[in-house]
Swiss-Prot record:
It comes from Mus musculus (Mouse). This is Secretin. It is found in: Secreted. The modification Phosphoserine is found at S62. It comes from the Eukaryota. The gene is Sct. Residues 1-22 form the signal peptide. Its main location: secreted.
Amino acid sequence: MEPPLPTPMLLLLLLLLSSSAALPAPPRTPRHSDGMFTSELSRLQDSARLQRLLQGLVGKRSEQDTENIPENSLARSKPLEDQLCLLWSNTQTLQDWLLPRLSLDGSLSLWLPPGPRSAVDRSEWTETTRPPR
């Protein structure tokens, strides 16, 4: 006795199932959230890369500077692990750039370069530069 032949419906179902599994999925259209994620990810990677670079540079610089400092002064000036320590050879230059400056109109300005202030007072300067009437 031979097994019964499959019905045409069963053959059609098998054909559909086998062909749909062989086809690749259609490509997904890019979404706005994909761009936001990749943008944020690349920004974080750049930030981590910059942080590693700074730690490498500062670490090397700190090691070079600590070789020249006696051991007893290291105990009190050792920075914490989480702090970023930049060692400047000229502290006066650093203070000049960090302290706020008075601009010509009397307001504080962090962007004026360091150095001695001009000998001309603000009122003298405005009188000499004022156009004639």
